Amino acid sequence: MLEILRIPGIAYRKVGENSKSNYALAAWAQKARLDSRTILTSPVNIDKLSSVLSDIRALTLEDPESFCPKLRQLLGECGIAIVFLPHISGSFLHGATFIEGNHIVIGLTVRGRDADRFWFSLFHELCHVIDGHIFNQDFTDDPEREAAADRFARDILIPVADYNAFIQTDCRSKEAIITFAKKIGIAPGIVVGRLQKENIIPYEWYHDLKVGYTISS
């Protein structure tokens, strides 16, 4: 189906699927592919990528104008070209990862994206790189590997032990969330997003803590 079927090992995160979404994914991935060809990177180095994950995580505390150049540099030194693309209506797509030439491409949808979803999607895609999923020619959206990538993203953003201890406290107050986020060195909106996802607080709460990103594609 379209060009997407000629991108071996593509791994992607999306929240639904239909025939329209598959064609949208194909168009989106082709745009990411073409944009990545203008980006210079070092040779692929997975060990280096693993070593800079904490540096990437620390960027959650910065705004896009500040963190985007740093993120591009960190990933470029690991052989990864990151491209930011607008959301395509009907695609359900958050991000995708694949090999193009001599480097790895990570594409993320960014227009109007909440910070918590942006960083979750990024670390989800980085898991596909670190765990070698994209080097499997037959891999696309294997459910078990997608679930593993979700767990990786969740737990690197908010470590398991810290989170489990936090939710045993009065974790629903804004003050508690801000204090906890500062303690673990993460943006408070990411903590809010996690608590909302797990139905610990309503989705209507604390929108002032959730930053929306607009990043030029």
Regions found by a protein language model. Give the residues of each.
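Active-site hotspot residues in diverse enzymes, especially metal/ion-binding acidic/histidine motifs
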Residues: 1-217
